[in-house]
Amino acid sequence: VSADVSDAVSIEIKPGAVVSNLLLGGGRYYAKTNTVNIKADQATIMAIYAGGYDQGQTTNTLTTDVDASVNGVKNVNMTLSKCTIPEGLGTGGGQGYTHTGTSVVTVTDSELGAIYGTLSNGYADDITVNMTNTTFKKQYNGSDIQYRELASINRGGVKNISFTFDGC
């Protein structure tokens, strides 16, 4: 099964919503998307992966170009306001050999367990993250995460990355 979305996909999470597991910007395995727009306001989302979930189940490798990638997102635009993300936010790449092109992520007045550029062998071309008035909390009810972490790469790779923190 495969999906190839040449247009934009928009995901909007409204105030009070709870995502009790993982939110994927892209899809699983053979799923490719041109643009993903994620907007969440006053929501609780256990974890977010900007790209997809490859899990090493496709023909992708760590160095597969985003245009040739069978699992990935070319453009990621993410805006999170007043959100709680207990297990963390992955701003580019994804799980397994997922590839993202350009990610632009804005986080304001939120609380996170961790933030990553790329995740678990994911790869990204460009990631820009702007965070304002955001805090990192060590322990969350319902989460096994026992630490705060900021990492540009959690295995995998990234060509260019920028994190900006204001009032955090």
Where would I find each of the regions flagged by the language model?
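Surface-exposed loop/turn motifs in large extracellular/passenger domains
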Residues: V1-N21, G27-A47, G52-G88, G93-C168
